[in-house]
Regions:
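Phosphate-binding/catalytic loop of phosphoryl-transfer enzymes
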Residues: 1-79
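ATP-binding/phosphotransfer module of carbohydrate and carboxylate kinases, centering on a glycine-rich
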Residues: 2-6, 20-30, 68-171
Length: 171
């Protein structure tokens, strides 16, 4: 801080990404946003009323429990919860489920429909509990651009008409 003559602080990488998005990117000027990274794990940053959410720990949204897809018999890889979002939808979870790295499965629609089911379920939980103006998705798994329309459709399906807002059109 002394060397740079600017305020300095430490936080998680995903909170840094979220701050970048609300300062300069996809959520510029928003007061309530969530950034989720899905890659080797699942991390999340939450901005609520213009402040990063901190409590006893940083938000562990990657460890929210998931209801398994009716056609998915995979038990999950999380050593603590097995079927949490990270255990079901992270890159290592996909590799354990299919025996191949996620980026080699791009042409198999069922893989991405299942992935969208879990991510969509998590987003519904986040929408209903935190009410963000925007949710930003990042991380290696999200490089599969076919996921975005599948996730959007899954969120609408799982919300089942409960919420109707313009923000849901721009998840």
């Amino acid at each position: 801080q002394k060397a740079l003559s600017v305020p300095c602080g430490f936080d998680t990488d995903v909170n840094g990404s979220l701050l970048g998005e609300v300062s300069y990117g996809a959520s510029k000027g928003m007061e309530n946003a969530v950034y989720i990274t899905i890659g080797t794990g699942v991390g999340a940053g939450v901005l609520s009323n213009g402040k990063l959410l901190h409590g006893m720990l940083h938000p562990e949204l990657g460890h929210m429990a998931m209801v398994s897809h009716e056609n998915d018999h995979f038990r999950g890889i999380c050593p603590f919860h097995r079927n949490c979002l990270e255990g079901m939808a992270s890159g290592p979870a996909m590799e354990a489920r299919y025996g191949k790295k996620a980026d080699t499965l791009a042409d198999i629609p069922m893989v991405w429909e299942t992935e969208a089911y879990y991510i969509g379920q998590a987003l519904c939980n986040i929408i209903l509990t935190l009410s963000p103006e925007r949710i930003i998705l990042g991380g290696g798994v999200m490089h599969q651009t076919q996921l975005f329309p599948l996730i959007h459709a899954e969120v609408k399906k799982q919300l089942n008409g409960y919420l109707k807002t313009k923000e849901l059109d721009d998840i």
